[in-house]
Amino acid sequence: MAKILVYRWKAYNYIDVMSTFAKLGYEIDEISQPLMNYDVDEEFGEMLRNKIRSSVYDFVFSINYFGIISDICQDQDILYVAWSCDSPMISMHHESVYNSCNRIFVFDRSNCLEFETYGVENVYYLPLAVNVDRINTLLSTAYEVNSASFYENDISFVGSLYERNNYDEIYENLPEYLRGYFDGVIEAALQTGENGLHERMLTPDVLNELEGCFDFVQSSQRSFSNLELVFANNTLGFKIAREERIRNLIEISKRYKVGLYTGSDTDELIRVENRGPVDYWKEMPRVFANSKINLNMTIPNIKTGIPLRVWDIMGAGGFVLTNHQLELDMYFEDGKDLVTYSNNHDMLEKIKFYLENDSLRNEIAARGADKVRKYHTYDERIKYMLQILKDCK
């Protein structure tokens, strides 16, 4: 029997990926020791080396990429396979990505193209997926009658509002010119919906001025991330996501009932019903299945890829209304499998239309669910991954 060694951490889709490997005949050993440092961690390194030497493994696997695991696999002459579920992966901007042991799969095609321009080999595009069987099993079981109102919505949104974003923390320390400039950048990104606009606005002059007031510390001497990458994604990206989510929810709630499932502070959203966070495994699919419209707002850090949330909604048979992402066009028909919006006004118009057209809305949700069940399961993704590994030998 084929055997793999897996680094386990709290990734949402970990169980789905592992159950798929098991279904395909793999014996799975796990390590789960927390990493104190993604670059150098002697205790973790010793543990991983000993584990690799203790048996014969086809490869070491992790969800998301870890440079320290890659270096150890390179040293131990064993294949390291990683499937990125975050975007962008700052940890991939590390010298270890050039290790020959790596087979790195990324769900955002733009990241794949980016690393190809760096001359990194063995980086492959692999979209995320959904475990339809698991979700259907959950949805086939009854829940308490008094729970129905918790799950049922005209419009629902599940996700963070990013109130603890780095931009708000540093805002008052920025020079007045930069505050005004970034306020304009954020507003332009929100008004146009243009992906990557905030990155292009980080000109050399702006970055030079930012260096004097933004505490950027390289995480490692082997890292090739920079101020532009970190500020665009970890700072501006999450701020734009917060503003988009707050503004959209406020506008929607002026007209319709909105159920929000989040652990974030919602004091600004006086008309929105905050139902608190939901469990990814036991509750979230029920929200998607029982909401007339499931709203997705992709964080700007995901440039072209399809976030896990879209797959999860469609896998539960839910109707998806989402901002447009380039890769959606590769797999789905807008208005047939799901519906996209281009800006706030377009979103409100489509909410109105689809709330008034139940049969069309249900038809789109059913067609989308059928498509992901046929073509976008973890079985399909892992089989494709294994074929790539076979072809690369």
What are these regions (language model features)?
Residues 81-96, 106-107, 134, 229, ...:
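Nucleotide-sugar donor phosphate/pyrophosphate-binding loop at the beta->alpha transition
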Residues 47, 69, 92-93, 282-283, ...:
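Short acidic active-site motifs
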Residues 64-65, 84-87, 109, 127-130, ...:
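Histidine-centered beta-alpha loop that forms part of the nucleotide-sugar donor binding/catalytic region
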Residues 73-75, 96-99, 148-150, 253:
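Short, conserved loop/helix-junction motifs that constitute active-site signature segments
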